[in-house]
């Protein structure tokens, strides 16, 4: 391999017995057993046991002085381990290396934690990320990330895609998430924006005739962070010309199947199921449903319109209200304390409470039910609830009644919490499997109550369905888009759409968004101009590489599959970024800081 080593530690196996090897790595552990020193030597491929015998005094003296995380080089002979001392958990577990020579390449100060400590806080791990990345799980995660990216490139290259870079410094378009702004020193008072996606550039590449484009690139969004969000993230960005929506979906479904098979030997469905946005929201309250959870909403809005219970009838008679039931088979065993905990949980999502009915005996109707709300419901409503939910003896039915968004968010989250719980898994409410699907036919627009206007659900370059073009000017709320998301186990793996390729339709969409011609020209004139030069029909997808690898690795957060991530406060604890800069730098950029005004006392 090199003049310093002949093999990786973790790849030395019994086939090398009797051979001389040179190994380099870090001391995982040093043990002194009856005058013989054992060293667990670690590199990126794993561990090997090195035996240091006192018969070689100079080498043995060096071995006595080493400590954890010293970087060393050893030479020695591979031999079988004595019978009964093999370690089946290691690739090298049947052999050991009898050390002939040991060199300390670099000592180490005492690490702030043991690398095999699984209870470290994330703050400690991110502050000492260099050491954290030495841990086997992190080594695995980042190598898996490389493998996924490599498999994506292999697939797309074979399909005739061309890897083209697009600019990192672009124009700010204050739509959607906030941009990260970069001041221009040579153009005082002007700013670049880091790209939220290469969306417009890849569309212009299609106009330029490149036909099939991709890049694996960084994108930036200055938004509030969650477990699956970072201010900078990596996107597998793809665009094609002259393909229909179905052909685009088929192509990238095949890509995802290939990547999962080659990267982690998982066979995804031969054909992903397809679900309309409307159906996903009706059944699961989410446009990215986790199909592993075997619980669904039951629509009860109509049933509750005439009940003498304002908690239900109020939302049922409201234009933007919704009432649903969530039947949990066997849920009668859920304790009152657990119900109280679930009530607190749905409150996180804006729910004002959590109504429930335990079904003791269906055949007895009202008398077979246990709940404080039964007295508020007439017999017809109770009968309809039991019928529609398919309730059986021993079940519990939870209810959501509020604005549709609150119901979808709160009962949707409750569905997942119960399904993923020990109770859910023990009662067959969760299937441990890979469950992909396409969600399609998204609305083009959603209404922003605060600004009293329509906003694009995806982005303003998404094409409306051909049969809905008339709604752009008459009723934008009815307009559906040629948009599609690939969902896997409740995570959006990628999303895309067929794009608008005619400038007249693009202008109509801008007008529906209350972006007048002058504003559209100022923000997107270069795209509108490009569309006039025979732009081809085109569309594509963008996949979140971080999310894909997180799912494959079974990691808790995308921060576990990124080498140097930011915290949920968008800070890098290793380098202490972001940081203040000196006055000279600000003057060169023609920037003066404005001190935040103190908030008045309430």
Swiss-Prot record:
One of its GO terms (molecular function) is aspartate-tRNA ligase activity. Residues 199-202 are annotated as: Aspartate. ATP binds at residues 221-223, 230, 492, 544-547. It is an enzyme of class 6 (ligase). It is found in: Cytoplasm. L-aspartate binds at residues 175, 221, 458, 499. Aspartyl-tRNA synthetase with relaxed tRNA specificity since it is able to aspartylate not only its cognate tRNA(Asp) but also tRNA(Asn). Reaction proceeds in two steps: L-aspartate is first activated by ATP to form Asp-AMP and then transferred to the acceptor end of tRNA(Asp/Asn). Belongs to the class-II aminoacyl-tRNA synthetase family. Type 1 subfamily. This is Aspartate--tRNA(Asp/Asn) ligase.
